[in-house]
Amino acid sequence: MLSLVSPLLKKSIVIQLFSITVYKFKAKFWYKLPFETRLCIIKHTRPKALSVTKQVKRDYRKIAILNSMRK
């Protein structure tokens, strides 16, 4: 799978938001990559700090829920 992804990344710009869309310069159009390829790219390019930020947000939600239940 990675051998397929690396040449694709060299030839195209990959934008990672919620889904990965690729713009081909030669053909001049946008298309979505297959789900497995998108998942592979996300796993290999995900910043580690992002997961820590999500955990902090979850903790705040839990605290807010517990506080509202106490009242």
Swiss-Prot record:
It comes from the Viruses. The lineage of its organism: Viruses, Riboviria, Orthornavirae, Pisuviricota, Pisoniviricetes. It comes from Feline coronavirus (strain FIPV WSU-79/1146). This is Non-structural protein 3x.
